[in-house]
Structure formats: C-alpha cells, structure tokens
C-alpha cells in the first residue's frame, strides 16, 4: 500500500533532485505538490516544480502556486547559490500540463481532508504555504500524519552564523508550523551536511542517460563552486533529498525528540531553530519535533544513485 504524500518546494537545485527521487519511491503516492517563493521568486519556483515533475514522467501530479512572499519580512532569494532561475541556468523542457490556479493552501487542505490522518507533507522550502494552511483551516493540523522538513540547524546556520536558509526565509511561518502540534521531523544542517555526493558521483549520474541526468549534472555544476569556496571540496549536499528519502528509508537517519522554537526577534539569532536537546531539564513543553542528528551518508549516496539510474 502506498502512502499519500504532498511535496512543498521552492524548487532550487537540491529541490530538483528531491522531486525526482520522490517519483521513484514505490511506497509513495504523490497526491499533489506546491511551490513557494524561496530560492527564487514564485513564478520561477512554480515553473521549476512543474517542469521537473514532467521531466520525471509525472506531469499528472498537480502543482499549485503558493505564497509569493514571507509573512512579515521581504523575500530574500538565493541567486548566489541557485542562480536567478533557481536551477543554475540548466535548461529543461516546459511542461505541457495544465497550469493550476488554485492556491496551494486550499489544495493542500483538500488533500488532507481526502486522506485524513494519513497524509504526510514533505516541505523543502520556506514554510509559508504550510503556515497559511494552518491559519486558514483550524482543523488542518489534526488531519496531518507528519511533516518532514528540510530546515533549521541546532548548531549553526548557512545563511547567517545562527540560521539556516529555509527557516530564516520566513521565521514567523516556521514558528507557526513548529507550534501547530503537527508531528514534525526536522532535517537540519546537522544531518544534511552528512549526506553528500562527490564530483565522481555526479559524473556517474551523468552517464546514466536518463531524462533527468543532464539537469542534475548541469544544475549542480553551478552550485558546487560555492561549496568549494566554503571549504567543503568538490561535493554537493543532499539537503532536500533527506526528508524525501526518509519516507522509504528511515533507517538512514537517527534523531531525538525535542521541543523547537524559532527566534523571530531581530538580532544575531534571528531565524534560528532553538531546541532543548542539550539541556538537563525540559524547557519547552511541546515536544513534537524529531530532530535528525545522524545520517548514514554512504548508504544514502548509494541508494540515491540507484534510484536515479532506474
């Protein structure tokens, strides 16, 4: 039996691989997808999600446009990492699927009602669309089985010394999601930095001759110099692929249940995910977040390549 899953994405370079992998999992039924502004403005992320799913042979999955901007702060996209189009300039065919116009939060709520207590959400961008759904539909939170997010960092950030990009992109929306009571599985930088592919891995993927092989190689060729400049070497991180792979391969990850808040006050810690993981007494009463801390990078890389070859 397949499990119903909804993917919410800001369709950057690592999102593209995550979307493709989601179509390859035989235990997952993709019941819908949505785009949010983040790595790039909404018109580009909406286009990218549609095109990537079509490239993966799943143009039947309806993609809904979501939030164009964060709740309370200006949009601060990431062209330095993902290029102005979100995919590092990689060219892929345009999807000929009908373009949906319904708001993402309305479509997501309908999906939750159609799959009560079964729907799992994978959110790999800012959490604006999810927070909008929570606020508009009070019953929504009780209908969701789980939300697996790529976002946050217990130790340190990548957008600022304290904050990870997806959370600081809309910290007020993220705080809404963490405090909603929905069970959250958080794949922050603490674990995603353990999951990577090498330049040799990417060359191997490029040799597969699959429809998405060129996209993965070209897009990641854009972002790899950023990792080299930051001292990581010729690798890419599988940030957004982590919550997707967790759906079918939870054994790749280890975590600990914790309370998590998001710092929404201005200052050097703005956008940080603050947890009570390492204190000696309970500090945060709501412990609804499984914070992933360890990952089997070797097993992850092997399985990712296997799926992308299939």
Which residue stretches match the model-derived regions?
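Conformational coupling and interaction surfaces
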Residues: 1-2, 21-22, 29, 168-170, ...
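Active-site histidine-anchored catalytic micro-motif
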Residues: 2-9, 13-50, 85, 90-194, ...
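Metal-dependent C-N hydrolase catalytic cores
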Residues: 3, 46-114, 287-294, 305, ...
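Short, functional N-terminal and low-complexity linear motifs
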Residues: 14-21, 72-79, 96-99, 139-145, ...
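Acidic/polar N-terminal loop/beta-strand segments that form early-domain functional surfaces
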Residues: 35-38, 66-68, 265
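A residue-level signal for conserved active-site and pocket-lining positions in enzyme catalytic cores
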Residues: 63, 177, 244
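Residue-level marker of positions within ordered structural domains that often coincide
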Residues: 68, 182, 249
